[in-house]
């Protein structure tokens, strides 16, 4: 998926289910047709159960001074389907710009990954982009262990199955596995599972920019501390009219509003009536980010986990953000993380970039 969010640190400390350094692996296979089917190797690196941890995140967001909801609410099965419609929308320029850039620069980008490396993709995302990069690595005769990391088990398994069809274990240099967990879980797993091989983390789809610049720096710092390098794709568009068309259309409206019934499902109550809320998008010039909000259509009183929260008509709950960071901003974010941009590949207009980031 293009966007994968994480769990708040406060929620983690309250509801940790697995100890920090315990990770589990599972393998499964299906052979109902009698054919030889590859096993799916999936490492459960979660330090807490995602669904259970989202409930305190919802409550924390309602209690905060600037009310917000966890972006992970958007990524249930229906949300994944709705986001596919966003990607296919003619107004959604990030998808076409990123694909064009990757297609043109994939060989150069792939040279930053050596034979024997571990390649971890943050977010079990767009198979078209992933397959392009893995096919290029295979054409360069490189042996690579690829891991897709995601919080959604079913999406992760689908991703692994599709890639195993393209890269069969018996005939391919590319070995496919999965990591089930958040970005923080992945960083913890890396620190506990150090390899003699170098690890490259791939973060495509402008997903890093779902976090504020400060949060993005913290993630980069965490991943670089394990000795890894990062390949990060980021949108640097500054045309606010184009951004609004891309992020405030009907497809995005349906995608964001889907977070409300998902919240109800997790809470076990109909606290959020989707008819009581509207979607609106706004540009935050201080953070260089587009932000999506739920806006109350009328005065509301919501009861969640035994507490009542009041909203006046027009009051908002922030849902998801998308940063638009040009190269100079990306370099600043990396410096704050103790890293540096070692190489970069830009489209002709320099409105979209892929950055190779390492420790300074």
Predicted regions and their residues:
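Glycine-rich SAM-binding Motif I of class I
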Residues: 127-131
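Conserved class I S-adenosyl-L-methionine
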Residues: 116-125
């Amino acid at each position: 998926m293009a966007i994968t969010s994480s769990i708040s640190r406060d929620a983690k400390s309250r509801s940790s289910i697995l100890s920090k350094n315990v990770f589990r692996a599972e393998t499964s296979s299906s052979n109902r047709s009698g054919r030889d089917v590859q096993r799916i190797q999936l490492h459960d690196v979660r330090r807490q159960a995602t669904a259970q941890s989202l409930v305190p995140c919802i409550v924390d967001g309602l209690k905060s001074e600037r009310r917000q909801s966890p972006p992970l609410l958007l990524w249930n099965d229906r949300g994944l389907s709705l986001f596919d419609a966003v990607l296919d929308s003619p107004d959604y320029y990030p998808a076409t710009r990123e694909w064009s850039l990757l297609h043109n620069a994939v060989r150069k980008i792939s040279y930053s990954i050596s034979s024997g490396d571990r390649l971890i993709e943050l977010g079990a995302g767009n198979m078209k982009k992933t397959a392009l990069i893995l096919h290029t690595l295979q054409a360069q005769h490189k042996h690579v262990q690829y891991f897709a990391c995601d919080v959604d088990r079913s999406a992760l398994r689908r991703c692994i199955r599709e890639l195993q069809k393209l890269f069969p274990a018996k005939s391919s240099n590319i070995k496919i596995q999965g990591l089930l967990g958040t970005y923080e879980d992945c960083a913890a797993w890396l620190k506990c599972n150090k390899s003699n091989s170098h690890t490259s983390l791939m973060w495509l789809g402008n997903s890093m920019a779902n976090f504020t610049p400060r949060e993005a720096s913290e993630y980069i710092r965490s991943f670089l501390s394990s000795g890894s390098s990062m390949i990060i794709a980021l949108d640097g568009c500054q045309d606010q009219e184009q951004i609004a068309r891309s992020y405030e259309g009907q497809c995005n409206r349906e995608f964001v509003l889907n977070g409300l019934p998902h919240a109800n499902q997790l809470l076990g109550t109909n606290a959020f009536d989707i008819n009581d809320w509207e979607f609106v998008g706004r540009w935050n010039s201080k953070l260089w980010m587009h932000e999506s909000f739920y806006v109350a259509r009328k005065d509301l009183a919501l009861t969640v986990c035994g507490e009542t929260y009041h909203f006046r008509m027009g009051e908002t709950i922030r849902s998801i953000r998308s940063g638009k960071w040009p190269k100079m901003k990306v370099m600043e974010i990396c410096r704050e993380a103790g890293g540096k941009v070692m190489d970069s590949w830009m489209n002709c207009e320099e409105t979209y970039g892929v950055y190779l980031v390492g420790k300074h």
